[in-house]
Amino acid sequence: MSAETEMLNFDGGFLRRGFWIYVWQVMAPDDRELYYVGRTGDSSSCNAQSPFNRMGQHLGFAKNSNMLRKYLSRHGVEPNGCKFRLVAHGPILDEAENLQTHQERRDRVAGIEKALAEAMGVAGYDVMNTVKCRKALDASMFAEVRDAFALEFPRLQADTG
């Protein structure tokens, strides 16, 4: 194996903690474009990490947090051969100081995560994950999030008809 020089550029805003929605766009070696929709805001603690922190977890080897790696594997894709793009919007809600507020905020963001994953699938993006959530959708917050992502994923444009 020969050494190579790799490069990663990112905006400092990616370091802000709080509740974010994000989309991974993965260009696989076989030219497929795959997508993964996620959020920050733990289900098991009061933490709402930054997208930067979550990025490393997604592609790492810890079984409880490497969901992107798992989905790529299920699609027969080796991450080392891919090109990645992470688009994150947030923080749409601040990190909470107590568990009850954290859970309320997490649930609002989870509803938006599910709606965005479904909207991207309907728009023709090959979304690898199905977000399972029964929480109520905050429609106005979702509209803002969808519009923000539509700037990067144009087929998400709201139906104006």
What residue ranges belong to the model's regions?
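Boundary/linker segments flanking structured domains
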Residues: 1-34, 40-161
